[in-house]
Amino acid sequence: MCIRDRFTSLTKEALPIIRYRTRDLTRLLPGTARTMRRMEKITGRSDDMMIIRGVNVFPSQIEELILKRAELAPHYQCVLTREGPMDNLKVLIETKPGVAPDGIEARAAAKMLQHEIKVYIGSSVDIELKSEGGVERSQGKAKRVVDLRHK
């Protein structure tokens, strides 16, 4: 079932704002009345989605797995490239301060993360560990996806 969300202000404090097709990813919760449905928290945006070898991948899925690893910092970037007909995804991840990117524990964490991503998402990725500050930072919204594929 296709549902188009419409948002508006219900108070007199602001002008009514109506937005269509917000591209927010969420799901409707069971409601008590048809006109008063509630939504679960927004999990991401559909325009952040990457298609890798026919698999829909969201940066938030990768971030969820990164945050489970104690050796890795939450600073990452997904780099998309194309070699021949195949799309490749490389994830650049910073290690936490005091953890060397080429150290045994960091490499073990990267290998485990690579396996978890393959199982969870269904597509293999390359992991490249960087030291603190090695992943490009941006002002405002973090730039999580860099697409280097030729259009």
Please place each PLM-identified region on the residue numbering.
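Active-site glycine/GP-rich loop and adjacent strand/helix microenvironment
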Residues: 4-151
